[in-house]
């Protein structure tokens, strides 16, 4: 199990912020923190670069997405990161 920090722990019980149409299960019990992919093999960005993500959207981000380009996958993820950062700032989890 990876080391969790306050950002990754804050995903518990949150609404999915990735929200892929036809994929998202909207189940807050399955929400995890989906980090952006890092700069190298098996690397992840810091936890401020992640999104609250339901289990189905997370599987979609990690795998093949028929009908979508990799750039479209990245865009959905980045939009989720922005929405997540706004929530974390609003809730005092991420302080700028």
Predicted regions and their residues:
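Residues immediately flanking
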Residues: 36, 56-57
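Polybasic, low-complexity binding patches
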Residues: 40-48, 59-96
């Amino acid at each position: 199990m990876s080391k969790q920090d306050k950002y990754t722990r804050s995903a518990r019980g949150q609404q999915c912020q990735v929200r892929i149409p036809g994929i998202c299960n909207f189940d807050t019990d399955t929400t995890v923190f989906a980090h952006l992919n890092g700069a190298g093999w098996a690397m992840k960005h810091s936890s401020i670069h992640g999104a609250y993500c339901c289990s189905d959207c997370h599987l979609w981000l990690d795998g093949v997405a028929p009908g979508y380009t990799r750039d479209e996958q990245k865009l959905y993820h980045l939009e989720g990161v922005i929405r997540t950062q706004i929530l974390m700032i609003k809730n005092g989890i991420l302080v700028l």
